[in-house]
Amino acid sequence: MKIIAISGYKSFIGNHFYKYNKKKIKIIHYKKDINNIFELKKFVIKNKITHFVNFAGLSRIKCSKNKIECMKTNFKSIKSIINFFNELNYKPMFIFISTCHVYGNSNNKIKENSKISPNSLYAEIKLKSEAYIKKNYQNYSILRLFNVYGPNQPKSFFIPDMIEKIKNNQSIKIDKSVRDFIHVNTVSRVINFIISKEITGILNIGSGRGQSLKSIINLIGNKLDKKPLLEISNKKSKIVANIKFLTSKGFKFKKNEKNFNI
């Protein structure tokens, strides 16, 4: 029997994952500080956790403001969890939420073994955690999420920021970048699939479809019935997932699930 626990249940993705599964599967919240390994040990042992999904951690913006706390929460806590799991007489599946920001820009769709080029402290520490997990544990899935969006996303993220600026008739400065957007409910469905099939290793989690920032903003404008005030530079970058590994395991996108839809 699978006993699934999550940390970071108040986070954007963690909260959606819980709500998405509320009537589907039982999920137990770890509600205490992820850095408190003593409490975590008691929680895992008491509940006989078989699958642990770690949504806890500082965001990219918060990491840039507090390097020490970022290292503590986004790396040292992961190290402590892995060390603890290795002490158990069984090995819970550890699902680690990572990021596409560990990659650099690429004209081609990015594979799991594509060149690594973290572009921020947040990405560097995610990569550091990945490396520790890979070296010291076997039963893991590392999920490199691309541009996740959905309801109630914090305003510091791209989509809610654009919605706010369009509503307020603010000028929007962008470049000719192309990104891979995936809805948070689809991410939840992917995680369920990975748990049910016990898929291990590193997986890109995106739609596999590249869309320009301009096209996304115009779609938002159409939805709001307001024309965005765009200033577009000639700078270009592209980060789009190759999702063949995920689909080769049997995951199938629903009709229109790859399309951007707010």
Which residues does each PLM region occupy?
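Conserved Rossmann-fold NAD(P)-dependent oxidoreductase catalytic core, especially the SDR/UDP-sugar
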Residues: 79-121
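Glycine-rich NAD(P)-binding loop of the Rossmann-fold in SDR/ketoreductase-type enzymes
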Residues: 35, 65, 69-80, 116, ...
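NAD(P)-dependent short-chain dehydrogenase/reductase
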Residues: 119, 131-180, 184-188, 220
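C-terminal substrate-binding subdomain of Rossmann-fold SDR/epimerase-dehydratase oxidoreductases
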Residues: 18, 166, 170-262
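NAD(P)H-binding glycine-rich loop region in Rossmannoid oxidoreductase-like domains
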Residues: 37-73
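N-terminal Rossmann NAD(P)H-binding glycine-rich loop of SDR-like oxidoreductase domains
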Residues: 2-22
